[in-house]
Amino acid sequence: MPRSFDRFSLRGPLALALCLLGLALSASPGAAADPRGVSPASPNPLEGLRFFVDQESPAWQQWEAYRRSGQTAKANLIWKIAREPRALWLGAFTRPHFAVKVRRLIDAARAQGAVPIFTVLRAEATGCGPGYTGGSPAEDARTREWYEHLARVIGDDRVVIAFEPDSLGTLDCQIPSRRDDRLRLLAQGVNALSRLPNATIYLEAGASDWEAPARTAKQLRIIGISKVRGFMLNVTHYDWTAANIRHGLDISRRVGGKPFVINTSQNGRGPVSYRSNHRRINIWCNPGLRGLGPPPTTQTSHPRVDAYLWLNRPGYAQGCQGRPIAWYPPRALGYARLATTWESPPRGSRFGHFKRYPLSAFGIPR
């Protein structure tokens, strides 16, 4: 796989073929016999897949812009993001022409001989506070139809779906009378998508620095974990991979041994935290001085972990602190500069790369 943009300066078919060959997550190009992989005892359905790299993404376009303008150092940094397969986010924001856009991504993946990963974010689960309803019955109906529409658009195509990040962890953000509605809505979405014959699905399960495993496991059973491959962790958080493995194994034993995947797109330096009432509180909203984590792979540290995947979008700012959800090149460059393959803090380094957090670690997008 190229580590410098200079080695990818030839844009012909041979260069593209070599690049895509290097993106295979396994030496074998074959897919599992059962793409759904519902039984925990079935082979890892991600093993041997080549995942889609979107050459229309902001990261890829940024790399090309730096390359064209001769900014070699920045191009080499952004290439660390652009070259990796990352999830494609779908939601109410995927408009207009939702079906056309989804089919275009699926067709582009097929042209690469690859499989797209979709992070589905359609449920109203981004707010929090007194009186927050998380939508309405009418909005729930629109979301149910959206799930069904997505299922029709995907059809028989091979895909991986990361279903509704944060939707369980933020359940208590809703007013009590709406919480069961959220669970019913998620269950209906799981039911619609789990019927897809060639979709490997992982459900939202928070992160190791969030809800207790017993509570998350109960919610997973309610929304239909038995119908899909497993669950996902750390999609919007930054906690260490090793911590998420421990947390995930605790959840897994409570849901019949279901496998899981971990988002490692932004946890190469771990979380930024502070102490409050003798508890460690991790900052999830655009912490500074974070780094890319282990690249996507099915070669993980535990057999119950199907893969480390980049389910989030490094270089984007999350929609908080008054900032829109958007691509910020300085933030992307920062992630790339501080990239590591660490799964836990190295010995002698309390917070990854420094003993104390500098003030900038608590800042907004950098």
Where are these regions (language model features)?
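Bacterial N-terminal signal peptides that target proteins for export
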Residues: 2-15
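Surface-exposed substrate-engagement region within the catalytic domains
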Residues: 53-78, 208-337
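Active-site cleft segment of glycoside hydrolase catalytic domains centered on the general acid/base Glu
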Residues: 133-158, 165-199, 207, 211-215
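C-terminal region of N-terminal signal peptides and the immediate post-cleavage residues
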Residues: 23-41
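Bacterial N-terminal signal peptides
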Residues: 13-26
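N-terminal carbohydrate-binding/catalytic regions of secreted carbohydrate-active enzymes
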Residues: 46-149, 153, 313-337, 346, ...
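Structural preference for beta-strand elements that scaffold enzyme active sites
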Residues: 115-117, 158-162, 198-202, 228-232, ...
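Short glycine-enriched loops at secondary-structure junctions
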Residues: 120-123, 162-167
